[in-house]
Amino acid sequence: MKRILAIILSGVAAIWSAAPSFAQQDTSSAQQDTVRILGVGNSWTRDSMRWLSAIAASAGRPVIVGHAYLGGSTLEQQYHGIDDPSYTYKHRNIDQVVHNTYQYWKYSGTDNPVKTPAEGYKNGLAGIGVTLESVVKDEPWNIVVFQPHVIVKAHMPDYCGFDINHLVSRIKEMMEPEVAKSVRCGIMIPFSYPEGNTDYRQNVVDAYNGGIRPSIQDEWDQLYETMHCEIQKDAIKLSEHMGENCSFVINVGQAIYDTRKDRHLSGFGYKLQRAQNNTHLSEGIPMYIASLCYAYILLGITPDDISFYPRLSRDAHLTGDTGKTIQTDIVNTKSDAARARQCAWKALSLHDHQ
């Protein structure tokens, strides 16, 4: 299995090394220009882009970061809802309209958003929100990052019957011609969970030492390795299928997979995976690691360039036999942040092919 994983990772590295990036260009002028980055996906896009603007600002790179997300959706569902105001999908067992229920968050050099959904937004379930087209037209975006849906059982859904290139083309049609001509598109591979494990930690967050129980850790790690191997195959398959529409791959799943094995960092939310609702990254160090991946891949930023880090991480765990979930704020230290930056950098292996 380890040999197979190494082969697959080398394939991903080849994709990155072949793809154009800010890191491989003359950045003397790029550093003076504002880079506008838009994420399109579900709430895992929100998680992963949470700290990108603040990270870039601390490295002296002016950016505008926006993410338009539709909770619990796939890119296929978003594509169908662009031009069909009546198209719905199931979200939390409720039929939700796609067309005008996007949440749009926007950041510009700060760790707090400069634009948020309107008060009373209710996550779009009340039919309150914005269209994807309005977000695309809000800025002359330089980069658009698409986030394929990754299901808990390990795989992206087979894109048979839906071609992600259709969504890329449709979004370019919304842009001014000169913007569409120069925009760079690519994909972000999210983190996922292993399947086939009876360990209840797959469904809830616990408070064991860094989430590790040695008696079953070998089984847990083997399941993660199997699952992650499949995600790497999916990443290669999808990027090759997108062809020229995929100029980069941001493998957040790779970074989370690798750093979850760090006994120190794994204390920030179980294995860096989940916050209170057992689905999302915790807002502090875990989201920071995900945002670092964007900064490294898209902006050519290195760990030594960055001074910003979130001051708190929110850890969720169960109490006693009641199963009640409580949250505890953990104070992050400079050494925590430095460790996170190095772990994310090492996981992406950027030093091998920049």
Sequence positions of predicted segments:
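Extracellular/periplasmic catalytic domains that process cell-envelope and extracellular macromolecules
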Residues: Q31-Q32, V136-P140, E178-A180, Y288-I289, ...
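Hydrophobic/aromatic-lined pockets within catalytic cores
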Residues: A57, K172, E176, A295-P303
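Conserved catalytic region of serine esterases and O-acyltransferases that act on ester linkages
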Residues: L265-Q354
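Alpha-helical cap/lid subdomain in secreted, periplasmic
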Residues: L125-E283, D305
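Conserved SGNH/GDSL esterase-like catalytic core that processes O-acyl groups on lipids
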Residues: R46-G161
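N-terminal module-boundary/linker segments of secreted carbohydrate-active enzymes
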Residues: Q24-G60, V65, D352
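Sec-dependent signal peptide recognition
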Residues: K2-S10
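C-terminal segment of classical bacterial N-terminal signal peptides
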Residues: A14-F22
